[in-house]
From Swiss-Prot:
One of its GO terms (biological process) is CDP-diacylglycerol biosynthetic process. This is Glycerol-3-phosphate acyltransferase. HAMAP family: Glyc3P_acyltrans (MF_00393). The gene is plsB. It comes from Yersinia enterocolitica serotype O:8 / biotype 1B (strain NCTC 13174 / 8081). One of its GO terms (molecular function) is glycerol-3-phosphate O-acyltransferase activity.
Length: 822
């Protein structure tokens, strides 16, 4: 580089250092993209901009990547280490220099032809200042590139809202080997790079925003809404104009009013807020979504719902991943001042709890959702319908998902892909309210006062987690499961083909399974799991560390799913972090520390334990069977677990099929034996007395679930003809009784949704006949197996209420030896 050029770059860099504070995407490009800083890198930028180049250089220096200003010298040939695909517009348009990108690509390909060992990494990089999509009909398109003067003002006003996006590298060695090294390949490289950057920019900025009233006018002209308006006028005996005004009023209630300026402002506020409330936001597998957006997919985000914070957190994360924040389906209960108008400007559109009895509303909402898809906006909705009060996933609500498939049946060209997302926290601000609601308190209506009270409590929230699960392309799903689905395409009328409901229910189940497949274990949910497993909710520091190590080894050595994230910290580091959250007490004596979960915190901590219960449920079940039965063959253990696995699968959205179960159990048994929690004697699995404590704590993870199953099965065995409603009600009553008598501090233990799922599974598995009567022989078999995994006291409480004398005669005699329950 010449001396004058160095001086020029230094002078230009001075204002950039003051004005530009760019984010890098992904956060760790070397690791996430597999870059090798020791190998030559050719940086590829979309168009000639020295501001972009110097912004890139600053990030390369921060990431320990080669300097894009220093030329590469290979085999005595010196070539620039960066290339601009296009020159971009000029201030003085009569001067248009020749494009050099094709020549530079050709020179690099020539080097690879002459040197078989050479392999240069071609690294596409885009630098963006601001991301305003613009309004429809307002002048220049949002994908335009800027000349020097425009770039100056962009840096001046938007330097703090800029990002540097690194993409996956392309091997020039592979290009040379597979496609050759002539000039046509160089032209092709430049053309493909140009398309890549154009798509990437569209994914970051999104389509132009419509004027709200123009959108309403367009919706009013849709055939479906015209028909619904006519029906409204006829059924309510009002004028057509009045019915049309009713439709517009509903559009005003529903529609978002997205504003880029509001997003920019909220990003600053949220960045400040997260940095003070959270110790970190952990994001995993975001590259999947970036790639989908770049490939032109219509993305529907379907996260689990833990907290009102979810709305803000996910939009914040997506914005920082270089993606457009989605339009979010929010409950109408959040449409209060000032939250409603703010959420609306950030992309929220509001949805009522039920559409029943209001055809005009359902039609307007369906058409609005379809219009969002048609225009290419990403959408987010919570498939659970509401926030989970227990920390587990709720049964999915399928209304909006059904409308998503109906939108495909309008004949839209863009492929729709569902992206399940796991959102987790070490502290959920509403968890105290959830516990009260589960105990019967009336849900408090959302309001400004409630919001201010909630904000007052926000402090020391630990870590947050956003894990993107495995996407579900709807076209692929329908092609596989409903090959004839295209026969139902109708651009005018909303279609409800016979296959729609079964397909939607199956899809909803797959979404929940994939959310759980992306769960995040953390210090809080691991420590809560261990302490709640102890009868006195307390463990010595050594015992707690031993149990944390047991959980971590299980999760690392036998991963539940490839997308599950497990902390890379030691048990000591996790415990120290959890103690800093001020949820636990530490009592010191002459021997050492005792970690105590206070009684008032115990109920709240079940929420965090339940976040990851599905990750440990099968090892807990194996541990329980070995602990209570002392010795058991692998075949018998598989037989017993196979009997209750369908109930666990339905309740916890487990991903293992019945066919995968034997191999999964064998792998888990081998790991438990490796940890010496059990002894594998070849023909039998035997209790290891030396490791009874961690085995008991592990087994306790399934204890309450098995007791709940035993309650329902004992009632069914005693009264096979009991109807579903009575069975669920009596099961809840008995569960409440059991929780009082035996100190079970878990509100979900008698949650009606859990019993409803259980009874539905029993029917599907054939324990309840088509006539509605239980098959006593089968229910008793499972109950007897479950009762062998409970203490005599718990078993006696259940049977004293549910079992008449004649049924008790069918039960096995209790063992003489009592086994302590922890």
């Amino acid at each position: 580089m010449s001396g004058w050029r160095k001086i020029y770059y230094k002078l230009l860099n001075l204002p950039l250092k003051l004005l530009v504070k760019s984010k890098v995407i992904p956060a760790d490009p070397v690791t996430e993209l597999g870059l090798d800083p020791s190998r030559p890198i050719l940086y590829v930028l979309p168009y000639n901009s020295k501001a972009d180049l110097l912004t890139l250089r600053a990030q390369c220096q921060a990431q320990d990547l080669p300097d894009p200003l220093i030329p590469l010298e290979i085999d005595g040939v010196q070539l620039p280490s960066h290339v601009f695909i296009d020159n971009g517009p000029r201030v003085f348009r009569y001067y248009a220099p020749k494009q050099e990108s094709v020549k530079i690509f050709h020179d690099y390909l020539d080097l690879h032809r002459n040197n078989p060992e050479l392999d240069i990494q071609m690294l596409p990089v885009s630098v963006m200042f601001g991301r305003s999509p613009g309004r429809e009909g307002h002048g220049t398109p949002h994908l335009r590139v800027l000349n020097g003067v425009q770039k100056f003002f962009a840096v001046l006003w938007l330097g703090r809202d800029s990002f540097v996006r690194f993409s996956t590298t392309v091997s020039l060695r592979r290009m040379a080997s597979e496609h050759g090294t002539d000039k046509t390949i160089a032209h092709k490289l430049a053309r493909v790079a140009r398309m890549h950057f154009s798509r990437q920019r569209l994914a970051a900025v999104g389509p132009s925003l419509p004027a709200r009233q123009d959108l309403f006018k367009k919706l009013l002209t849709s055939k479906a809404i015209e028909k619904a308006v006519a029906d409204e006028a006829r059924t309510k005996k009002i004028s057509h104009e009045k019915a049309q005004q009713n439709a517009i009023t509903l559009m005003e209630e529903i529609a978002a009013d997205f504003s880029y300026e509001a997003v920019r402002l909220s990003d600053r506020v949220l960045s400040w807020t997260w940095n003070r409330l959270y110790q970190g936001i952990n994001v995993h597998n975001a590259e999947r979504v970036r790639q989908l957006a770049q490939d032109g997919h219509e993305i529907v985000y379907v996260p689990c719902h833990r907290s009102h914070m979810d709305y803000l957190l996910l939009s914040y994360v997506l914005y920082h991943q270089g993606l457009v924040p989605p339009h979010i389906a929010a409950g109408i209960n959040l449409n209060f001042w000032p939250a409603g108008p703010i959420f609306r400007r950030l992309g929220a559109f509001f949805i009522r709890r039920t559409f029943k009895g209001n055809k005009l509303y359902s039609t307007v909402f369906r058409e609005y959702l379809g219009e969002l898809f048609t225009r290419g906006y990403s959408v987010e909705y919570f498939v659970e319908g509401g926030r989970s009060r227990t920390g587990r996933l709720l049964e999915p609500k399928t209304g909006t998902l059904s409308m998503t498939i109906q939108a495909m049946l309008r004949g839209g060209s863009r492929p729709i892909t569902l992206v399940p997302i796991y959102i987790g926290y070490e502290h959920v601000m509403e968890v105290g309210t959830y516990a009260k609601e589960l105990r019967g308190a009336t849900k408090e209506k959302e309001s400004l006062l409630q919001m201010l009270r909630g904000l007052r409590k926000l402090r020391n929230l630990g870590q947050g987690y956003v894990n993107f699960g495995e996407p579900i392309p709807l076209t692929t799903y329908l092609n596989t499961n409903v090959p004839q689905w295209r026969d139902a395409i109708d651009p005018i009328e909303a279609q409800r083909p016979s296959w729609l409901t079964p397909a939607v229910n199956d899809l909803a189940g797959k979404i929940m399974v994939r959310i759980n497949n992306a769960a995040a274990a953390n210090a809080m949910n691991l420590c809560s799991t261990a302490l709640l497993a102890s009868r006195q909710r307390s463990l010595t520091r050594e015992q707690l560390l031993e149990q944390l190590d047991c959980y971590l080894q299980l999760m690392r050595n036998v991963p539940y799913a490839k997308d599950v994230t497990v902390p890379d910290k030691t048990p000591e580091e996790l415990l120290n972090h959890a103690l800093n959250m001020n949820k636990f007490e530490v009592e010191k004596d002459n021997i050492g520390d005792i970690i105590i979960l206070p009684r008032e915190q115990a109920v709240l901590m079940t929420y965090y334990r339940n976040n990851i219960q599905h990750l440990l449920i099968l090892p807990s079940l194996i541990a329980s069977m070995v602990m209570y039965q002392r010795r058991i063959t692998r075949a018998e253990l598989l037989r017993q677990i196979s009997m209750i696995y369908p109930m666990l699968k339905a309740e916890l959205f487990l991903h293992y099929s019945k066919e995968q179960l034997p191999q999964t159990l064998d792998t888990l048994i081998d790991e438990l034996a490796r940890q010496q929690l059990i002894c594998d004697k070849g023909s039998e699995l035997v209790l290891n007395p030396a490791r009874i404590r961690p085995l008991q704590l592990l087994a306790a993870g399934v204890r309450e679930t098995l007791q709940r199953y035993a309650i329902t099965l004992s009632l069914l065995s005693a009264n096979p003809s009991i109807n579903r409603g009575a069975l669920e009600k009596e099961s809840r009553i008995m569960a409440q009784r059991l929780s009082v008598l035996h100190g079970i501090n878990a509100p979900e233990f008698f949650d009606k949704a859990v019993f409803s799922t259980l009874v539905g599974t029993l029917r599907e598995e054939g324990y309840i006949s088509d006539s509605g009567d239980a098959i006593q022989e089968h229910t008793l078999e499972v109950y007897n197996m479950l009762s062998a995994l409970m203490t005599p006291e718990v078993k006696l409480t259940i049977e004293s209420v549910s079992m008449p004398a004649e049924t008790n005669n069918l039960l096995p005699e209790p063992e003489a030896e009592d086994k302590e329950e922890n």
